[in-house]
Amino acid sequence: MNLKEKTRALFAEIFSYPATHTIQAPGRVNLIGEHTDYNDGFVLPCAIDYQTVISCAPRDDRTVRVIAADYDNQVEEFSLDAPIVTHDSQQWSNYVRGVVKHLQQRNNAFGGVDMVISGNVPQGAGLSSSASLEVAVGTVFQQLYHLPLDGAQIALNGQEAENQFVGCNCGIMDQLISALGKKDHALLIDCRTLGAKAVSMPKGVAVVIINSNFKRTLVGSEYNTRREQCETGARFFQQPALRDVSLEAFNAVASELDPVVAKRVRHVLSENARTVEAASALEKGDLQRMGQLMAESHASMRDDFEITVPQIDTLVDIVKATIGDQGGVRMTGGGFGGCVVALIPEDLVPAVRQAVAQQYEAKTGIKETFYVCKPSQGAGQC
């Protein structure tokens, strides 16, 4: 039974009437463009075929009722006429509450909803299960009540809910790609303007995500330190963001910067350039050049931004040794663990899976998780 069938069946069973709509919103993986989003730079993610699915129907009152199928059918209920506050024990429900609260501030022309939620985006793997949930909930209200909100506004609403209501800092990329993703394409997103350009993916290429399953510990504090270092760099150049600094301008005065800040700045500037070039390489179907850019990106994250760990570097080395120049591999996500992403010809997937299975656990003592994904459509009815 797929997620649509599961949520529709559960909806009818619990609410004793049929759902009118089923909405999905996907998770995502970032192919290249790491730690560039909060520097007003470029990212190149694609939506993946793991998603949050919600079967739903409008109510004729002001109550929102939610069933979380993945949490033992926990029930959540709140009124649109009372102040929406955080739930003490059900963390999942705060994503729903936050999205609805921020939607009210944008456009209050909606009533109550019954919904059943289920998803298969792996949690804690850096594949944006939370953004997928936020965008799915926003799309439910937009579709049921014909709200005049586009995908970018639904994405911004989700980001606000996560930052201000749930209390977790994030850029806009995760929600934007979940809302705007296009089947068989990646999106080159300009994080300053939120402009997005669809980039076609070469035929016969698989998006492979391998979770190192190394438990991330430093990610919060180190993330904030990296942001501060980037802001220090932008101030040195008297620019609003590192997006506005050229590599030439940086190279001319790099020796005057604090050495650590200089390394952080160099990563962001070079990563922005790589990301724009990667979009053009993908569009041309030049997997070899894409692989070189992904290798440079990983080296920059390892040596200049210093956010990889030995387990991640080991995974990258195993994959690279298997595929040679027929594709690329790099760490993806915030760093200090998490996943690597590889773009490889579909016929090489079994060899990569086997090499990783034979070598990674032997070298690190940790068993990986292996996902083969397809670039998928963004949020909407399913």
From Swiss-Prot:
Keyword Amino-acid biosynthesis: no
EC number: 2.7.1.6
One GO location term (cellular component): cytosol
Keywords, comma-separated and alphabetical: ATP-binding, Carbohydrate metabolism, Cytoplasm, Galactose metabolism, Kinase, Magnesium, Metal-binding, Nucleotide-binding, Transferase
Any GO MF annotation of the entry: galactokinase activity
PROSITE patterns for the chain: GALACTOKINASE (PS00106), GHMP_KINASES_ATP (PS00627)
Binding annotation for substrate: 34-37, 223
Enzyme class: transferase
Listed GO biological process terms: galactose metabolic process
Binding site for Mg(2+): 130, 162
Pathway(s) served: Carbohydrate metabolism; galactose metabolism
Keyword Kinase: yes
PANTHER family: GALACTOKINASE-RELATED, MEVALONATE KINASE/GALACTOKINASE
Function: Catalyzes the transfer of the gamma-phosphate of ATP to D-galactose to form alpha-D-galactose-1-phosphate (Gal-1-P).
Entries under HAMAP family matching the protein: Galactokinase (MF_00246)
Protein name as it appears in the record: Galactokinase
Organism: Salmonella choleraesuis (strain SC-B67)
Gene from which the chain derives: galK
